[in-house]
Amino acid sequence: GLVDKVILRSVKYAPCEGCNACHKNGVCIIEDDLIPLFDRILAMDALALASPIYTMGITAEMKGFLDRAQYLWARKYILKTQYFSREHIRGHKGVFISTAGTGWENVFSSAFPIMTAFFDIMCFDYYDNIIANDMDRHRGIRNHPTAIPEAREKGKKVVQVISALKGEG
């Protein structure tokens, strides 16, 4: 399949203004690069969101991106105009990828509910996390003993699951 890689710092977008205009008609009043990006995401079979953990949370760029999906939340939960069947959601997998410098076990804990909410808004099954902490001690991902093999294995697995659901595997 096709892979569409987007680096958020290269995308021109503004944060959500909290104006709630989208609660009336399901349309975001901000016209920038995110609306077409969200349209592309809704058509994807899999979505991997990647953000390092800084100060116990995802990056500001990622949070700003996720918050802009508020208009889709409004469509789903206020206006009830965005609906996908359970079968559709089962066939659309979301994965969170992250690293953290510290070795603390709970370093990713603040990110998980945010990802859960976003994948729900986008009608994706939050399938898995590919996470590795203790990067400072290992001096980067390449020296981490399990990060790359685990990422490859989990990446293959999500592709296999989607292929099987589509009858391709």
Please report, for each region that a protein language model flagged, where it lies by residue.
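N-terminal beta1-alpha1-beta2 submodule of the flavodoxin-like/Rossmannoid cofactor-binding fold
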Residues: G1-A74, M135-G169
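Active-site donor-binding loop signature of nucleotide-sugar glycosyltransferases
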Residues: L8, T99, A132
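Short, basic/glycine-rich phosphate-binding loops at helix/coil junctions
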Residues: C16-C19, V95-F96, I131
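Short, glycine-/small-residue-rich phosphate/pyrophosphate-handling segment
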Residues: A74-Y127
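Beta-strand-loop-alpha "switch" segments that mediate conformational coupling across diverse proteins
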Residues: D128-D134
